[in-house]
Each structure stands twice: as C-alpha cells, then as structure tokens.
Curated annotation (Swiss-Prot):
Keywords recorded for this protein, A-Z: Ribonucleoprotein, Ribosomal protein, RNA-binding, rRNA-binding
Entries under PANTHER family matching the protein: MITOCHONDRIAL 28S RIBOSOMAL PROTEIN S6, SMALL RIBOSOMAL SUBUNIT PROTEIN BS6M
GO cellular component: cytoplasm; ribonucleoprotein complex; ribosome
Stored Pfam families: Ribosomal_S6 (PF01250)
Cross-referenced InterPro entries: Ribosomal_bS6 (IPR000529), Ribosomal_bS6_sf (IPR035980), Ribosomal_S6_plastid/chlpt (IPR020814), Transl_elong_EF1B/ribsomal_bS6 (IPR014717)
Coiled coil: none
Functional note: Binds together with bS18 to 16S ribosomal RNA.
GO molecular function: small ribosomal subunit rRNA binding; structural constituent of ribosome
Protein name: Small ribosomal subunit protein bS6
Family: Belongs to the bacterial ribosomal protein bS6 family.
Database matches in CDD domains: bS6
Organism from which the protein derives: Ehrlichia ruminantium (strain Gardel)
The keyword RNA-binding appears for this protein: yes
GO biological process: translation
Gene from which the chain derives: rpsF
Length: 109
C-alpha cells in the first residue's frame, strides 16, 4: 500500500483536549477503512500569512498514513466535511522519513 503525508490545519479555538479528540477521530476513520497511522506530529499553534475564515492562527498537524488510494480518497472526503479542519494537504511519499520533521526540530530549539 502507498504511503501518504497528510498535513492539516485545525481551528485556533480548539483546546488541546478537543484537538486530541479530533486526531483520535481521524485515526479511527483511517482504521475503519483499513489504513494505518504510522506517525503523528503536532507542530503547534502557528500564525497564518493571511486570514482564513476570519482566523489568524491554526493548529498545524501532520500524519504519515499507509493506505490504499480508494480508502485515502474516502478519508479526504470525510475530512472536507469536518468543520474543525480549515485546510489540508495530502502527498504521496516514497518512504517514511527518519527522525522528526524540520518543524518539530525548529519548535524544540
């Protein structure tokens, strides 16, 4: 099965508890469709370059997912319907990167 990098921005008004619930809900959607969540990273509450839906900040999160293309299409369709997710980007990757991403490394410095 192919590997996908799924990055999304959640609303700034979500508490940490609500954000964890959103991530758990997304991961349960994946497992229902036969996909596997390999890695999850929280990048933090970051400023936007421009306002999105009258919001200036958002919670940036990234997931690495192993899934078939049909189940990934279904997952993306359901994420579009979720009002807590403002934007997302899904990319196909060749392999899982080692270590933390640059965003996590920058936030730890």
């Amino acid at each position: 099965m192919p590997l996908y990098e799924f990055t999304f921005i959640a609303q700034q008004g979500l508490t940490q508890y609500e954000l964890e619930g959103l991530v758990k809900g997304l991961s349960s959607l994946l497992t229902k469709n036969g996909a596997e969540l390999l890695k999850y990273e929280y990048w933090g509450l970051l400023d936007f370059a421009y306002a999105i839906d009258k919001m200036n900040k958002g919670h940036y999160c990234m997931m690495y997912i192993r899934s078939s293309s049909t189940s990934m299409d279904e997952f993306k369709r359901k994420v579009r319907l979720n009002e807590d997710v403002l934007r997302f980007l899904c990319l196909k990757r060749d392999k899982l990167p080692e270590g933390d991403s640059l965003m996590v490394q920058a936030s730890q410095a």
